[in-house]
């Protein structure tokens, strides 16, 4: 999957339908994924259908990132580093997330 080609699609979707509509679509896709998880747990759908719903959420999350890429990436790195620290994979303490957000503002 080429990120440049995907970014072109994400930009076109946001330009065509607007950020507010795409946030709404993200909420809708997350709801469908939640329902699919419950159906999968009760063996009402196959794994491929569950993965399909996850992909829909992933596409929408990529659009959410596209709208706020710098802040999104900063917070993502913070969260991954926090997990890394909890797992004992690093001794570096996590920086304060509020400082990350203040640097953005």
PLM region spans:
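Flexible "arm" and connector segments at domain edges
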Residues: 1-105
